[in-house]
Design a protein with these regions (language model features):
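ER/Golgi luminal nucleotide-sugar-dependent glycosyltransferases, focusing on the catalytic module
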Residues: 1-270
Length: 270
């Protein structure tokens, strides 16, 4: 299990979890962890791509070293896999160590992929929608009264710019364009945080081929220089998040398990 962080000070704790630490961002790190700067890389895009600069590095530089018979998983320093739901306020570093997923259960062998429990858009209060996207909702008041209309596209428009998701989808290949468009229009939830655990190297290669080809095309629309605010600066990571949920649901047999939220900075600092 690769655990991605921005803080070199987290490496020791991540290793104690029996996870493989990955340090991204601009801080210097030592040789006892993975990064995204060596070999063929896109590390300069980390501000915009988030964890996908490591996925690219892994694909281009380390993939042959991965065991074909073992699960390949990814988590983050604030988000961890578990088989049980636990509220953030009930967690500590010690409890986290005893709760997170260390080994994939044998009964999961019939699946190709593990995804996080879905994020349901309509679980957010109406006032939050109004506060974030007043102009969007006023332009189409049905968003206030029709839960069905509050789909993935609506949520992306709200958080990352009106119609940006659809513009990006138009750049997809014919094998994904229509299916992904239907997914974001018809679904009111998605598997969040760009987290997954995959059992098949060949399946993961196919995913990497599709996602990076698409994100590279999206750069021609959105670029980098004019991306302002978190929602737009990280637009490539957010596009990937929605696509990941769609792609693995379309191409694999999957199961969903909880993701625990606990920022290890709370006790380790940075």
């Amino acid at each position: 299990m690769f655990c991605i962080t921005l803080e070199p000070s987290h490496v020791k704790f991540i290793k104690n979890l029996s996870y493989v630490p990955v340090v991204l961002g601009e801080k210097n790190y030592t040789d006892d962890c993975f990064g995204d700067r060596a070999g063929e890389n896109i590390s300069k895009k980390n501000k915009f791509y988030g964890e996908y600069t490591f996925h690219y590095w892994l694909w281009k530089n380390y993939f042959d070293n991965l065991d074909e018979k073992k699960w390949i998983g990814f988590c983050q320093y604030r988000k961890f896999w578990s088989l049980e739901e636990i509220r953030s306020e009930e967690l500590s570093l010690k409890k986290l160590e005893n709760t997170i997923l260390k080994n994939v259960p044998d009964e999961f062998d019939k699946y190709d992929v593990i995804l996080g429990k879905p994020f349901y858009i309509n679980q957010r209060r109406t006032m939050k929608f109004l506060k974030k996207g007043f102009k969007l909702i006023i332009s189409n008041p049905k968003f206030l009264f029709s839960e069905k209309s509050r789909n993935i596209k609506f949520h992306f428009d709200l958080m990352h710019g009106k119609d940006n998701l659809i513009k990006a989808i138009e750049l997809l290949d014919d094998n994904n364009k229509l299916d992904f468009k239907n997914f974001v229009i018809n679904e009111q939830s998605f598997n969040p945080h760009n987290m997954f655990i995959c059992k098949s190297k060949s399946l993961l290669i196919r995913y990497y081929q599709d996602i990076f080809k698409w994100l590279n095309s999206c750069e021609k629309i959105f670029g980098f220089e004019n991306l302002k605010g978190y929602g737009m600066t990280r637009i490539y990571g957010f596009l990937a998040e929605r696509f990941m949920s769609y792609w693995f649901k379309k191409n694999s047999k999957f199961i969903e398990i909880p993701i625990l939220f606990y920022d290890i900075n709370n006790e380790l600092g940075n």
